[in-house]
Amino acid sequence: MQVLASEAYSSASAPIQYAAIAAYESDQTKFLNHSKKILNLIGEHCYKKLKTNNIEVLKPEGGFYIMPDFSTLLSNKFKSSADFCKVLLDETGVALLPGSDFGFDSKKLIFRLSFVDFDGEKFLNYSYLKDELSEEDLNIYAPKIVKGINKIIDWANK
């Protein structure tokens, strides 16, 4: 019940949602297309890095987070997903949210990994100038994400 309540109370109220609709009535197509392009590139990068390192994860189809599952890789090392998150943060400085915060069994090592730690304005301005973005662009415009994913993988494989 607590998980459901937190999701209900942390949502925007109806008046705020209506205000957002009015704010977005102008043509936001260019902004949305480039935002999607950036988030698709980052999501694909995170997915590939985790998947090629034997970490179970579904390919993102939108949004700005993925839910990696470390259960097969590290299940015998941690009592709960919350314990895993604490140790990961202490040892690497990388923060994940435990799956138990989203209704998953606390013993399952499932997490929410958000990939939005980058300067969106700079990345968008660069994206407006490019037809295509590349993995190399992530090193320039999303270096914390690249570094964070690498830290997670190195830590999990030690």
Where are the predicted features?
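PLP-dependent class I/II
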Residues: 1-158
